[in-house]
Amino acid sequence: MAKSLVLSSLLLALLLAAPLASLADNNVLLTGDVLHTDNQLSFESAAFVMQGDCNLVLYNEAGGFQSNTHGRGVGCTLRLNNFGQLEIHSANSNTPVWVSLRNGIPVRGDYAAVLGPDQHVTIYGPAIWSTPAPNRHERGATVSNIPRVRNVLFSSQVMSDNAQLATRDYSLVMRDDCNLALTKGSKTNIVWESGTSGRGQHCFMRLGHTGLIEISDDRLNTVWRSNTVGQEGDYVLILQINGQAVVYGPAVWSTASPARGGASAAL
């Protein structure tokens, strides 16, 4: 299967051009989002596709994944529920065709499925911190060697010296004046900020393995922290296209780890 998935990935990337029905970028599926038939999450050469035959398939260079639901429904869609599970729904049934398993006790909340630089899909959540929603009518110091993603920061990664997350016209910037600022459009249009301008030199922001965001100066003094701490694990900070920066975690499921919750339940 892995060989066929790799050989087909480039062809699918060209054929499946329909946009994701989501308020997130094309590498992220949030709770409440819907991935319609023949739509996909994509990152670089990897694609996570809700196929027309009702099979959910991850095409990558790392072994791939599939839900094994070929022919089990019509007009199938993929959703991320508020317990951190992926659900495949058929247009002709009210019962899910397939639901992913998950680690730990299910907790209701907002989750995020991210197709990351490891070419696997991992679900993080629930959300434990966020900047304020800019529009309520819109929906809702070790440097890691994880490759950088434009709109996502992973646990142990660091931002400094005007590094930023970006999506559409929003940017979350760790400014060289020690202020963490969320801007829309121009650099001067600040939507949210940590309010730490001038409080340190050579400051950096780090996302820890408990979901804590911390700004420190070059002497490792804490300048600001989000004060939201979850259980130990892997977290992500996602800059969403509705202008919110949200921390999700810990990881509860991954296509990379079937023995630890990555297996799936076909109903």
From Swiss-Prot:
Residue stretches making up the Bulb-type lectin domain: 26-136, 150-260
CDD domains in the record: B_lectin
GO terms (BP aspect): response to other organism
Disulphide bond pairs: C54-C76, C178-C203
Keyword Repeat among record annotations: yes
Transmembrane regions listed in the UniProt entry: none
PROSITE patterns on file: BULB_LECTIN
Cited function: Mannose-specific lectin. Has weak agglutinating activity towards trypsin-treated erythrocytes from rabbit but not from human.
Subunit structure: Heterotetramer of 2 domain 1 and 2 domain 2 chains arranged as a dimer of domain 1/domain 2 heterodimers.
UniProt protein name: Mannose-specific lectin 1
Source organism (scientific name): Crocus vernus (Dutch crocus)
Lineage: Eukaryota, Viridiplantae, Streptophyta, Embryophyta, Tracheophyta
